[in-house]
């Protein structure tokens, strides 16, 4: 590995660590969540959470994330995350639930184009984020 590659690698690592420490401007509104629970059968239901995400035009951070707090879950059912710009689907993801019922999905918001030497915003503006997870039924449905 030549000196230029080593310097680039070290600079990249330092950038990642610094972006993890500095709070970002990318936000998802948690006060305006819409939650719908639809029974699948007697034992499990599908919990759908709809929220919004805003990525400002002047964003400098490379990563965004969707994080779910520990809660009840059903084993072997992943969380499905869907991003929409208006009605247009933009990005879909599937992530496993951790043992405590939490989940985390990290995704690129900004990327470096090595051909042009410029940063490119992958996400910019307002998005609707739909999160689907399977939960155990707490009540019997008739």
Which residue ranges define each predicted feature?
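Ser/Thr-rich low-complexity repeats and stalk/linker segments
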Residues: 2-12, 16-142
């Amino acid at each position: 590995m030549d000196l230029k590659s080593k310097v680039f690698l070290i600079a990249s690592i330092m950038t990642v660590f610094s972006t993890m420490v500095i709070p970002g401007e990318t936000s998802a509104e948690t006060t305006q969540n819409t939650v719908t629970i639809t029974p699948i059968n007697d034992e499990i239901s599908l919990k759908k959470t709809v929220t919004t995400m805003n990525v400002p035009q002047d964003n400098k951070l490379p990563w965004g994330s969707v994080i779910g707090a520990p809660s009840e879950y059903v084993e072997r059912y992943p969380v499905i995350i869907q991003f929409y710009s208006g009605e247009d689907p933009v990005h879909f993801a599937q992530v496993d639930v951790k043992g405590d019922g939490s989940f985390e999905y990290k995704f690129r918001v900004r990327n470096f184009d090595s051909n042009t030497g410029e940063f490119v915003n992958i996400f910019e503006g307002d998005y609707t984020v739909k999160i689907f997870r399977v939960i155990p039924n707490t009540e019997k449905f008739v």
